[in-house]
Amino acid sequence: MDTTHNDTTPQRLMITDMRPLSLETTITSLTRDIITHRFIYLINHECIVRKLDERQATFTFLVNYEMKLLHKVGSTKYKKYTEYNTKYGTFPMPIFINHDGFLECIGIKPTKHTPIIYKYDLNP
């Protein structure tokens, strides 16, 4: 049987993403624990009080996320997680909408393996 012209020849499975899945699962879980309604509320409060632009608001979001991550896991694991986030670009990034000059964080942008997360879907 000649398989060179057969449309049903088996295709080779290509694995291009070599991230350690257990670490990704841990980071995703930690992110959901850290970024809550209260976290978003505090970011939105900073945006209004300090009249932040989108760049400043994103920086504030990331700094607060990093501080909470460090506090939650300790310095050794924190270093490992930030190296992973830097290498694979998995830092949670906020989605802002503009209300006449005031930004509101409405959720977190999707990554390759996680969907968009709206603030209404977050833990209280």
From Swiss-Prot:
Family to which the UniProt record says this protein belongs: Belongs to the pneumovirus non-structural protein 2 family.
Q: What is this protein called?
A: Non-structural protein 2
Q: What is known of its domains?
A: The DNLP motif has IFN suppressive functions like binding to host MAP1B.
The record ties this protein, via InterPro entries, to: RSV_NS2 (IPR004336)
The primary site where this protein sits is host cell
Keyword field = Host mitochondrion, Host-virus interaction, Inhibition of host innate immune response by virus, Inhibition of host interferon signaling pathway by virus, Inhibition of host IRF3 by virus, Inhibition of host IRF7 by virus, Inhibition of host RIG-I by virus, Inhibition of host RLR pathway by virus, Inhibition of host STAT2 by virus, Inhibition of host TBK1 by virus, Inhibition of host TLR pathway by virus, Interferon antiviral system evasion, Modulation of host cell apoptosis by virus, Viral immunoevasion
> Organism, per UniProt?
Human respiratory syncytial virus
* This protein's record includes keyword Cell division: no
Q: Name one GO cellular component term.
A: host cell mitochondrion
**One example of a Gene Ontology biological process annotation:** symbiont-mediated suppression of host cytoplasmic pattern recognition receptor signaling pathway via inhibition of IRF3 activity
**Where can the motif DLNP be found?**
121-124
Q: Where in the cell is it found?
A: Host mitochondrion
Q: Does the keyword Nucleotide-binding apply?
A: no
The source's superkingdom equals Viruses
**SUBUNIT field:** Monomer (instable). Homomultimer. Heteromultimer with NS1. Interacts with host RIGI (via N-terminus); this interaction prevents host signaling pathway involved in interferon production. Interacts with host MAP1B/microtubule-associated protein 1B.
